[in-house]
Swiss-Prot record:
It is found in: Secreted. Homodimer. It comes from Streptomyces luteoverticillatus. PROSITE patterns: SSI. The record marks 68-69 as: Reactive bond. Keywords: Disulfide bond, Protease inhibitor, Secreted, Serine protease inhibitor. This is Protease inhibitor SIL-V5.
Length: 108
């Protein structure tokens, strides 16, 4: 099996370079789901469904109504997914958008 081990973070700020990390967890998906993530099985299942495409995981649900305030939060994923290196970063404009778009992988 190809290794899958990630460090996931949520931070307050508009980029990974400047955001203060508020939470961080580990997630390993092979050979079995493990790590400090509160829902390892669900997060690994969501990653498998997207073929490890993190951009598909941070889509804001259709019909979501959020204010236009700028209070950014940034999520990151670093590590290895099915044998290939991953370095992902996405910034949500505000907490409402983050809640609507982060999915199971960034739910911690």
């Amino acid at each position: 099996y190809a290794p899958s081990a990630l460090v996931l973070t949520i931070g307050q700020g508009d980029s990974a370079a400047t955001a203060g990390v508020q939470r961080a967890v580990t997630l390993t998906c092979t050979p079995k789901a493990a790590g400090s993530h509160p829902n390892t099985s669900g997060a690994c299942a969501q990653l498998r469904l997207s073929n490890g495409d993190f951009d598909k995981l941070v889509k804001i649900k259709d019909g979501t109504m959020c204010t236009r305030e700028w209070n950014p939060s940034t999520v990151t994923a670093e590590g290895v997914w099915e044998g290939r290196r991953v370095s992902f970063e996405h910034t949500f404009a505000n907490p409402c958008e983050m809640k609507a778009g982060k999915g199971t992988v960034f739910e911690f």
